[in-house]
């Protein structure tokens, strides 16, 4: 199977988010890459589900709280940008202050 670099990157993000969701379910605090992957996948899946850009941004900004992440991680993530595939094409989604 031949994958483009973008497809490989998406697979890595989805794989990391799967691990991160499992760790979160076990009550572990997430590190920086885990937190970013969950926010990113939430935005990408919301877009794939047919939600609007605004709804995707709102949902992705509510998926994690400061209690879900290690100390200082929330301060390291002022925003997350992801190119998501919506029903009408791909768009850049910016999630501001994703961890509150």
Swiss-Prot record:
Q: What is its EC number?
A: 3.5.1.5
Q: Which Gene3D superfamilies match?
A: Urease, gamma-like subunit
Q: Which InterPro entries does the entry link to?
A: Urease_gamma (IPR012010), Urease_gamma/gamma-beta_su (IPR002026), Urease_gamma_sf (IPR036463), Urease_subunit (IPR050069)
Name the chemical reaction catalysed here. Answer: urea + 2 H2O + H(+) = hydrogencarbonate + 2 NH4(+)
EC top class, in one word?
Answer: hydrolase
Q: What is its main location?
A: cytoplasm
Superkingdom of this protein's organism: Bacteria
Keywords carried by this UniProt record: Cytoplasm, Hydrolase
Question: Which GO terms of the cellular component aspect does the record hold?
Answer: cytoplasm
Pathway field: Nitrogen metabolism; urea degradation; CO(2) and NH(3) from urea (urease route): step 1/1
Q: Where in the cell is it found?
A: Cytoplasm
Asked if the keyword Cytoplasm belongs to this entry, the reply reads yes
Molecular function GO terms recorded: nickel cation binding; urease activity
Keyword Cell inner membrane assigned to the entry: answer is no
Q: Name one GO biological process term.
A: urea catabolic process
Q: Which family does it belong to?
A: Belongs to the urease gamma subunit family.
Outline the subunit composition. Answer: Heterotrimer of UreA (gamma), UreB (beta) and UreC (alpha) subunits. Three heterotrimers associate to form the active enzyme.
Protein name stated in the entry: Urease subunit gamma
Tell me the organism. Yersinia pestis
